[in-house]
């Protein structure tokens, strides 16, 4: 573990005692949130030099668990200061004191606002950047802030869009459970020990109480042991003080295979407001849980069947938030991508080609695809796994399957319909059905353009099925080294599956298991602030349907 404390960084170490743990002997998520909020607040005040209050804590990801007897270290530092607010990066490491083994336990980002005395104006000093990683985080902080600021508009737009195809989403997979029995309400009286050093209710304490009622709500659905996996955002809308009554209301909103979203609302009442029944909405959060059974196996949650209008609003809201959450993953943190491309070896071309095709088929057959968008001829799905996000786009095309196959298997034609592709050329004709292409793509997020070296393996249907396959994956070819003009990027697994509907139409399914280098092209669409996937899909349909006999001569 790093022992040195960097300038501007605050470090807290805690030995986990029984009082900090839940019934399973694991560190309570609520207790951890209290410690994280305290550490982040002190980091903010160290930079600002004046009192600071929590505005929000978001993108909280729990990577592991900690148990009684282990030691945790919380590191918090300001990544960027804006005019009156700061983003604080929080990282929690757990260490076993017997083995010395360390693991990443949790990461999160908090936003704190400086609170001057009286009417004094505040303009926070910039963060002094000393390392390349600090510069990266400083730049990403600006991107994360943009996502936060546009969150409400993005959410409202997705909700508006989803209302047009709500029946399609609900009917995609019939729900079997209702959320009626998951409603939880609890009350807390704010006492002096619950207040922070400013006299307001300690934000970490409010988050801990919220986590408690959310856990109870999740347990009522799963009948197992729920554990907190992530939190979209704790958003503090207003303060509360000693003497306030805080009412916490929690209910399950929706389920996604092995996860469940629970929404929590907090209202504060002073003595007069309590008598009048007029509270103040001071906080909201959406907590995502996994759960295990008595054999410690992950539970698959039942699909939710919304019944009332409010059920449906919450059901759709959870889908929208999940979509935004997936889309903003690439701006949460910066990690160096591990090379995944296969080394091209002509003596193993058969094996590499077959592996390419099988990987695409396996991706398509995975369970857990969640629909995010439905249009007249287009459906978009996402699949969130432990370390990967994949996208699937189904298109109904008014053209024979063999025509679509010939057009899509010739990647030199892709720049004609895909706005991300600048150029695409064959650099190695391996066989009749396997080619290696060099591809250049457009600039994204103001960076340098990206280039790819990919193996394309195409297969016509076998006798026992009617599926045409076009599979892509990156390979390393010594004759095409990386260039300083481009960022050499990778395709893990992508391609098209084409099935005939009748003699004059087909279904084209595009799949892509996204690498870090490809995710920026898709993130805005998945997250709801771009329509690039829909636009590319519509362009692809138009390209195939409008293909002329002359345009097909080279591929037929």
UniProtKB/Swiss-Prot annotation:
Q: Which InterPro entries match?
A: Cytosol_ACT, HOTDOG_ACOT, HotDog_dom_sf, START-like_dom_sf, START_lipid-bd_dom, Thioestr_dom
Where the record annotates domain START, the positions are 327-536
GO CC terms, sorted: cytosol; intercellular bridge; nucleoplasm
Q: In what residue span(s) does the HotDog ACOT-type domain sit?
A: 6-118, 180-295
Which pathway features in its UniProt record? Lipid metabolism; fatty acid metabolism
Q: Where does CoA bind?
A: 54-56, 83-85, 145, 235-237
Localization per record: Cytoplasm, Cytosol
Give the reactions, separated by semicolons, that this protein catalyses. acetyl-CoA + H2O = acetate + CoA + H(+); butanoyl-CoA + H2O = butanoate + CoA + H(+); hexanoyl-CoA + H2O = hexanoate + CoA + H(+)
Entry keywords, A to Z:
Cytoplasm, Fatty acid metabolism, Hydrolase, Lipid metabolism, Repeat, Serine esterase
**Gene Ontology process terms (BP):** acetyl-CoA metabolic process; fatty acid metabolic process
Give the SMART domains listed for this entry. START (SM00234)
Q: Per its Swiss-Prot or TrEMBL record, what regulates the activity?
A: Allosterically regulated by ATP (activator) and ADP (inhibitor). Cold labile, it dissociates into inactive monomers at low temperature.
- Sites where N6-succinyllysine occurs are at 34, 97, 160, 229
User: What interactions and quaternary structure are annotated?
Assistant: Homodimer or homotetramer.
> What does the function comment of this entry state?
Catalyzes the hydrolysis of acyl-CoAs into free fatty acids and coenzyme A (CoASH), regulating their respective intracellular levels. Preferentially hydrolyzes acetyl-CoA.
What is the official name of this protein in its record? Acetyl-coenzyme A thioesterase
């Amino acid at each position: 573990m790093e022992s040195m404390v960097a300038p501007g960084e605050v470090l807290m170490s805690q030995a986990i005692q029984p009082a900090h743990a839940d019934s399973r002997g694991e560190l309570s998520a609520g207790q951890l949130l209290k410690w994280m909020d305290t550490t982040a607040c002190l980091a903010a005040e160290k930079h600002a030099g004046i009192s600071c209050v929590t505005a929000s804590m978001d993108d909280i990801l729990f990577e592991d668990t900690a148990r009684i007897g282990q030691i945790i270290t919380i590191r918090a530092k300001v990544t960027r200061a804006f005019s009156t607010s700061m983003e604080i990066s929080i990282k929690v490491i757990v260490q076993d004191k017997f083995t010395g083994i360390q693991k990443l336990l949790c990461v999160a980002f908090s936003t704190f606002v400086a609170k001057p005395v009286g009417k004094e104006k505040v303009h926070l000093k910039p963060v002094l950047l000393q390392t390349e990683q600090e510069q990266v985080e400083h730049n990403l902080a600006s991107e994360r802030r943009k996502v936060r600021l546009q969150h409400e508009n993005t959410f409202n737009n997705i909700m508006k869009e989803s209302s047009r195809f709500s029946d399609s989403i609900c009917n995609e997979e019939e729900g079997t459970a209702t959320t009626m029995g998951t409603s939880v309400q609890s009350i807390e009286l704010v006492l002096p020990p619950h207040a922070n050093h400013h006299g307001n209710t300690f934000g970490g304490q409010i988050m801990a109480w919220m986590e408690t009622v959310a856990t109870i709500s999740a347990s009522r659905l799963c009948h197992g042991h729920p554990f907190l996996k992530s939190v979209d955002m704790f958003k503090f809308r207003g303060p509360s003080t000693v003497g306030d009554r805080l009412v916490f209301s929690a209910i399950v909103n929706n389920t996604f295979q092995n996860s469940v979203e629970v929404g929590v609302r907090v209202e504060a009442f002073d003595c007069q407001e309590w008598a009048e029944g007029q509270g103040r909405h001071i906080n909201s959060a959406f907590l995502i849980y996994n759960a295990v059974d008595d054999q410690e196996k992950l539970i698959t949650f039942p699909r939710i069947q919304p019944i009332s209008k409010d059920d449906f609003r919450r059901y759709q809201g959870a889908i929208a938030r999940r979509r935004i959450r997936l889309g903003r993953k690439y701006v949460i943190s910066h990690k160096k991508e591990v090379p995944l491309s296969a080394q091209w070896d002509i003596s193993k071309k058969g094996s590499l080609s077959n592996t390419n095709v099988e990987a695409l088929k396996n991706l398509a057959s995975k369970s857990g695809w969640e629909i995010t968008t439905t249009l007249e001829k287009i459906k978009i799905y996402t699949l969130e796994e432990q370390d990967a996000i994949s996208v699937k786009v189904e298109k109904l095309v008014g053209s024979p399957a063999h025509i679509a196959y010939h057009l899509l298997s010739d990647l030199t034609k892709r720049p004609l319909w895909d706005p991300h592709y600048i150029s695409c050329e064959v650099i190695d004709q391996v066989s009749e059905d396997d080619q290696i292409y060099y591809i250049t793509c457009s600039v994204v997020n103001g960076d340098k353009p990206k280039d790819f070296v990919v193996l394309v393996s195409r297969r016509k249907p076998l006798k026992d099925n009617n599926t045409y396959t076009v599979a892509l994956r990156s390979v390393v070819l010594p004759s095409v080294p990386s260039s300083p003009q481009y960022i050499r990027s990778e395709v893990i697994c992508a391609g098209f599956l084409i099935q005939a509907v009748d003699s004059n139409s087909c279904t084209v399914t595009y799949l892509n298991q996204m690498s870090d280098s490809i995710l920026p092209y898709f993130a805005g669409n998945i997250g709801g602030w771009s329509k690039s996937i829909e636009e590319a899909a519509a362009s692809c349909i138009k390209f195939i349907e409008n293909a002329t006999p002359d345009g097909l001569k080279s591929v037929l």
